[in-house]
């Protein structure tokens, strides 16, 4: 039970009216201590990534696929991901974004059901239908993964450029 092993639920933060919703994997200890998503070194990298495409972090809404820290910060199991995915989809429907950015394999599995290698799916625009609304989404590496494997940052940069182009294509003000 993830809830029993966590200090608190990390729901989401940022602009609830944002046209962009970013979904990460799950909170870490820094997130839990501060009660916010994407804190510490991970948050610093995310902020830099967004600024690289002229988006201020406070102009997006971010949350996690699973809102509780896992024991020893391990990757959530497929069963845990599935348990929280309906809650996450409802969360997306409430925020009602125009674009979803899925960061990491947990987010990819929670929303798309795919559990193959993220490198096979990243950088491709896909669509998901939630409550009769079609949303474009893109999958990319999570900031925590990029910190562990910095050589993948070049691929994330390509993904970020695609996000910037989609924002322009859809004439989204951010």
Q: Across the structure, where does each feature detected by a protein language model lie?
A:
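A polyanion-binding, active-site-adjacent surface
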Residues: 1-174
């Amino acid at each position: 039970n993830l809830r029993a092993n966590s200090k608190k639920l990390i729901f989401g933060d940022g602009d609830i009216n944002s046209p962009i919703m970013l979904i990460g994997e799950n909170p870490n200890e820094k997130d839990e201590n501060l009660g916010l998503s994407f804190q510490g070194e991970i948050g610093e990298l995310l902020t830099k990534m967004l600024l690289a495409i002229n988006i201020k972090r406070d102009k997006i809404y971010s949350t996690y696929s699973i809102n509780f820290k896992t024991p020893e910060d391990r990757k959530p199991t497929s069963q845990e991901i599935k348990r929280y995915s309906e809650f996450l989809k409802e969360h997306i429907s409430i925020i009602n974004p125009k674009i979803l950015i899925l960061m990491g394999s947990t987010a990819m599995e929670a929303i798309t059901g795919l559990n193959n290698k993220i490198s096979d799916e990243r950088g491709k625009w896909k669509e998901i239908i939630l409550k009769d609304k079609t949303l474009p989404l893109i999958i990319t590496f999570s900031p925590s993964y990029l910190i562990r494997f910095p050589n993948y940052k070049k691929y994330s940069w390509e993904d970020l450029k695609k996000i910037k182009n989609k924002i322009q294509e859809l004439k989204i003000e951010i």
